[in-house]
């Protein structure tokens, strides 16, 4: 269970780095806003799901 928790945490951290770079770039380019909006919503949903998964796994590990 500890390995699954560590993998989920690594995925969350790496995905957070991607979002930290990707979201400002998407907001800064107004001509691609219609293309970027669904990706931002999808990325936000994936990030939120990863947060919940890490929280649940943290409950079982500790």
From Swiss-Prot:
It is found in: Cellular thylakoid membrane. The chain crosses the membrane at residues 8-28, 41-61. It comes from the Bacteria. It is a multi-pass membrane protein. Keywords: Membrane, Photosynthesis, Photosystem II, Reaction center, Thylakoid, Transmembrane, Transmembrane helix. InterPro entries: PSII_PsbZ (IPR002644), PSII_PsbZ_sf (IPR036512). One of its GO terms (biological process) is photosynthesis. SUPFAM superfamilies: PsbZ-like (SSF161055). The keyword Transmembrane helix applies. Its main location: membrane. GO terms for cellular component: photosystem II reaction center; plasma membrane-derived thylakoid membrane. PSII is composed of 1 copy each of membrane proteins PsbA, PsbB, PsbC, PsbD, PsbE, PsbF, PsbH, PsbI, PsbJ, PsbK, PsbL, PsbM, PsbT, PsbX, PsbY, PsbZ, Psb30/Ycf12, peripheral proteins PsbO, CyanoQ (PsbQ), PsbU, PsbV and a large number of cofactors. It forms dimeric complexes. May control the interaction of photosystem II (PSII) cores with the light-harvesting antenna, regulates electron flow through the 2 photosystem reaction centers. PSII is a light-driven water plastoquinone oxidoreductase, using light energy to abstract electrons from H(2)O, generating a proton gradient subsequently used for ATP formation. HAMAP family: PSII_PsbZ. PANTHER family: PHOTOSYSTEM II REACTION CENTER PROTEIN Z. Belongs to the PsbZ family. This is Photosystem II reaction center protein Z. The lineage of its organism: Bacteria, Bacillati, Cyanobacteriota, Cyanophyceae, Oscillatoriophycideae. The gene is psbZ.
């Amino acid at each position: 269970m500890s390995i699954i928790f560590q993998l989920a945490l690594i995925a969350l951290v790496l995905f957070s780095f991607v979002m930290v770079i990707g979201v400002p770039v998407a907001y800064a380019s107004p001509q691609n806003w219609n293309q970027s909006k669904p990706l931002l919503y999808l990325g936000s949903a994936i990030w939120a799901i990863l947060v919940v998964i890490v929280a649940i796994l943290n409950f079982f590990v500790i």
